Amino acid sequence: MKLKQNIEKEIIKINNIRIHQYTVLYTSNCTIDVYTKEGSNTYLRNELIFLERGINISVRLQKKKSTVNPFIAIRLSSDTLRRLKDALMIIYGISKVDACSCPNWSKGIIVADADDSVLDTFKSIDHNDDSRITSDLIYLISKIENNRKIIESIYISAVSFFSDKVRNTIEKDLSKRWTLAIIADEFNVSEITIRKRLESEYITFNQILMQSRMSKAALLLLDNSYQISQISNMIGFSSTSYFIRLFVKHFGITPKQFLTYFKSQ
């Protein structure tokens, strides 16, 4: 029974994750099963994974050590991503990438050929030093053989869409009671125009709003600096119980389960 409980503590399944920021993820203490609508892949411990912005995944994580965080992740802001893309285009002499002509490799998930030297380079990056993050990532990518796919994925992820502009507006103040009418006023266009432009990108305003709130909630839980009731208010929900129900519906687990799993001891 104790062995079963320990195994359950080391495993978690999280549904409906949308990657809003280009992410470099090091599986330092876990294996990850990643599920998309096309299928699934398993990524082993000590792998370096590049996740394109905009992909939707569900994951099953299994820790090696239950008291240690499962992975280390670097998430790039839109400004950092643009700077990185521009620098890589110059360094590698690439003028343009045609997203339509790119091979559909693992649906936006790329595993790097990462030896110990590459992994050590990743570990040495200071995630909080914005002044160095671009140069550090350029150096990291330069050490990876066959890095063309990574560079192309960065280029593709740096492309901005109208839905990104709507999301960025919402994320400036997630506590605000956003409506389609307010967004239309922000952009000085009609609600119908907003709706049609989002429909052309196969997404709705309500989907963007919910994705933004749930993603922010997950990041705030990972930060481990706030109570669940505080997070609920910060992302626009006055009722904590209602927030918890929505979190469970979205991710398939409770905020407490999420927090407990990712909390280092």
From Swiss-Prot:
Origin: domain of life: Bacteria
Key words of the record: Activator, DNA-binding, Plasmid, Transcription, Transcription regulation
Gene Ontology molecular function: DNA-binding transcription factor activity; sequence-specific DNA binding
Domain HTH araC/xylS-type: 164-261
Reported consequences of knocking out the gene: Loss of autoagglutination, hemagglutination and aggregative adherence to human epithelial HEp-2 cells, loss of aggregative adherence fimbria I expression.
DNA bind region: 181-202, 228-251
Keyword Transcription: yes
Classification via Gene3D superfamilies: Homeodomain-like
Subunit structure: Homodimer.
Described purpose of this protein according to its UniProt entry: Transcriptional activator of aggregative adherence fimbria I expression in enteroaggregative E.coli.
Note: Encoded on an unnamed 60MDa plasmid.
Protein name (record): Transcriptional activator AggR
